[in-house]
């Protein structure tokens, strides 16, 4: 039986021990309940006690289970956003807030291996035997670690623009500046204002920052996104999964620290069917991460999205990519 309760955020989730320069971001009030948090689309999260510690999660749909590992920063709400269309096609989506994000304390698991084991503990508590593990962006290390460490529980793996090796040393100066500004809470009010007043401008800025497209190509993609209500809503929704930053700061800082410590992820130990998707013009997690993963995982299917940025869900080929994902999932899903 699940043990559900109201989780209170305490000072134990503060990041002052990690880096005092980030103490200007206020911690969330300790009397804020996290039970029944809702994502932007109304998905409700719960907190379950596991052998690894308390974990915030959501579960929707029926059918073969897909476990989502969100990016950096993120939370269960990011998995809910990405999993909407898949859930509607006969799959159960289970998303969680990785340690340090929202309602999952950082002590549940700091390293990719620890987070993989914590995810397995979550599945135990939910009575789920096997899953397809899906990881995007900063969720890559935990995703690859889960598939390698828990092969008997993984019927397939899908990664998208995912980190597959050491990350952080190759960031461009502009990216480092934007990342520092984001961590210090300087960009959130600006982008929040853009999301509410000028969503088209927000889409243009996110596409510009998340890709290496030339100006003409970036403008063309922005126009396509603005003209498509579903894609425009996705961009706005994705931004909303970055807030409130005060409840994601611990996970963000831990992720950045862990990514720089990566020596070698257990890619060559992944035995399940694997689909690796990456955009050729991804400026956040560079294309070489996808190439490296595809080379290292035996039998992996590799989809190189020409002109794709870090936001493949709004790429020109978005419909084709969705069809490819579903085809892969249906081919390998347990009967």
PLM feature spans:
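Conserved HGGG/HGGXW glycine-rich cap/lid loop of the alpha/beta-hydrolase fold
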Residues: 58-103
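Flexible "cap/lid" loop of the alpha/beta hydrolase fold
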Residues: 157-189
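Glycine-rich "HGGG/HGxG" loop immediately N-terminal to the catalytic nucleophile
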Residues: 99-113
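Alpha/beta-hydrolase
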Residues: 178, 185-265
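Conserved acidic catalytic loop of the alpha/beta-hydrolase fold
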Residues: 114-131
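Conserved alpha/beta-hydrolase "acid-adjacent" motif
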Residues: 283-289
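Short beta-strand/loop motif that positions the catalytic acidic residue
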Residues: 270, 276-278, 282
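Catalytic active-site module of serine/aspartate enzymes centered on a nucleophile-bearing elbow/loop
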Residues: 300-335
């Amino acid at each position: 039986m699940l043990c559900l309760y109201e989780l209170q955020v305490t000072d134990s989730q503060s990041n002052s021990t990690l880096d005092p320069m980030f103490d200007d971001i206020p911690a969330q009030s300790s009397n804020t309940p996290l039970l029944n948090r809702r994502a932007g689309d109304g998905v409700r999260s719960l907190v379950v006690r596991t052998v690894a510690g308390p974990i915030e999660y959501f579960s929707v749909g029926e059918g073969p289970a897909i476990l989502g590992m969100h990016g950096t920063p993120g939370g269960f709400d990011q998995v809910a956003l990405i999993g909407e269309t898949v859930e509607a096609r006969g799959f159960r989506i289970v998303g969680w807030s990785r340690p340090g994000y929202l309602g999952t304390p950082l002590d549940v698991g700091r390293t990719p291996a620890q987070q993989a084991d914590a995810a397995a503990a979550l599945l135990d508590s939910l009575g789920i035997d096997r899953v397809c593990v899906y990881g995007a962006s900063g969720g890559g290390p935990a995703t690859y670690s889960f598939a390698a460490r828990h092969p008997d529980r993984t019927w397939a793996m899908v990664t998208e623009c995912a980190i597959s090796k050491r990350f952080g040393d190759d960031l461009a100066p502009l990216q480092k500046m934007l990342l520092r500004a984001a961590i210090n809470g300087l960009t959130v009010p600006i982008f929040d204002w853009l999301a509410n007043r000028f969503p088209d401008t927000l889409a243009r800025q996110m596409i510009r920052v998340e890709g290496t497209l030339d100006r003409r190509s970036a403008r063309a993609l922005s126009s396509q996104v603005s003209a498509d209500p579903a894609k425009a809503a996705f961009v706005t929704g994705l931004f909303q999964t970055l807030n409130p930053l005060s409840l994601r700061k611990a996970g963000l800082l831990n992720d950045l620290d862990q990514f720089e410590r990566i020596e070698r992820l257990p890619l060559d130990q992944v035995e399940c069917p694997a689909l690796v998707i990456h955009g050729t013009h991804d400026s956040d997690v560079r294309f070489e991460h996808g190439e490296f993963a595809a080379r290292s995982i035996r039998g992996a299917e590799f989809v190189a999205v020409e002109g794709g940025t870090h936001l493949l869900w709004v790429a020109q080929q978005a419909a084709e990519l969705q069809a490819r994902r579903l085809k892969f999932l249906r081919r390998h899903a347990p009967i």
